[in-house]
Swiss-Prot record:
Gene Ontology biological process terms in this record: translation
Protein name as it appears in the record: Small ribosomal subunit protein bS18B
Keyword Glycoprotein annotated: no
Source organism superkingdom: Bacteria
Single GO MF descriptor: structural constituent of ribosome
Biological function: Binds as a heterodimer with protein bS6 to the central domain of the 16S rRNA, where it helps stabilize the platform of the 30S subunit.
UniProt keywords, alphabetically: Ribonucleoprotein, Ribosomal protein, RNA-binding, rRNA-binding
Similarity comment: Belongs to the bacterial ribosomal protein bS18 family.
The keyword rRNA-binding is annotated on this UniProt entry: yes
Source organism: Roseiflexus castenholzii (strain DSM 13941 / HLO8)
Any one Pfam family match given in the protein's UniProt record, by short name: Ribosomal_S18
PANTHER family (UniProt xref): 30S RIBOSOMAL PROTEIN S18, SMALL RIBOSOMAL SUBUNIT PROTEIN BS18M
Amino acid sequence: MTFRNGGRLMRGRGGRRKVCEFSRLGILPDYKDPERLRRFLGPTGKILPRRRTGLTAKMQRRLTIAIKRARHMALLPFVERSVTDRRR
């Protein structure tokens, strides 16, 4: 797909739109399911943004709350171990 941008032709990024995994499965993000929550964490343990996860805004907010609860209950780490090992 090409389109004009200030007189220049730009090639857009093709691809399929991501579908919200939680809406597709009909479930809600739950802090008691750390394996499912880990898929939404980056390699350093940070929560991935919506544009990477493909979640709706509502589900992204619920996911964030579920991840934070799981971290406080020690079901998920705040920081991945590989990051802390590099500093030593």
